[in-house]
Amino acid sequence: DYFLGIAFIVFLKQNVDICVIETGLGGRLDATNAVKNPVLDIIATISLEHTAILGNTIEKIAKEKSGIIKNNVPVVFIKDKKSVTDIIEKKAEDNNCEAYGVTQKDFQIIKNYGYCIDFSLNNMYYKNDCFTITTGAVYQVQNCSLALTAAEVLKKTGVVKLESNAVHKAVKKVQWHGRMEQIADNIYVDGAHNPEGIEALICSVSPITCGRK
């Protein structure tokens, strides 16, 4: 809570245009709910984590996570598990929010080079647009698709002005430290800390290891 307060002071002094504020634990009771009028809510993949506090099922955790949804604020989320989708969409409906779900069908990996990935995105905002992320982490394709969709929602609502070329260049420059980060030959660092995250890491590492342990 102290760090969040300090962050708000820094944002204010720097006169930032947009703040990306990530919840620390869940959402419903998280300190970030001090922000009463966000311009957009984003919910990434929901998996079992912090079960002692958030609940021991995906559905219980989804209810906590959906607690960030505010009245008349659009929400962009990963639409994969039906039970989770139902909870998020119901919360959005109850709060008169437009909900935008990003599904596995929206994006397709064109080529994975190990150190970067080319993929295409096809939804209401992108028509098979191609992007490149500078990481071999396959799971980041989904995360990037979520971020790109969120950016377009912000553009649609008039919060930001974005040019297509600038978006493509920005995506290519993004780096995720501590997520499939190569720090030496054959040595990668990744902060996966729950079963789903570990499965995603294994999926990304497998093409690189080629059967080696």
Name the predicted role of every residue range.
Residues 104-106, 110-111:
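Conserved "HGTGT" condensation-loop signature of ketosynthase/thiolase-family condensing enzymes
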Residues 97-103, 181, 188:
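General small-molecule cofactor/ligand-binding pocket signal
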Residues 1-5, 16, 74-87, 111, ...:
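Phosphate/pyrophosphate-binding catalytic cores of soluble transferases and nucleic-acid-acting enzymes
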Residues 18-23, 30-42, 46-51, 60, ...:
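Nucleotide phosphate-binding/pyrophosphate-handling subdomain across enzymes
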Residues 28-29, 35-96:
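Conserved catalytic-core segment of NTP-binding enzymes
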Residues 80-82, 100, 118, 137:
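Active-site glycine/GP-rich loop and adjacent strand/helix microenvironment
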Residues 1-36, 52-54, 83:
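ATP-dependent carboxylate-amine ligase catalytic core
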Residues 111-128:
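Acidic-glycine-rich active-site phosphate/pyrophosphate-binding loop
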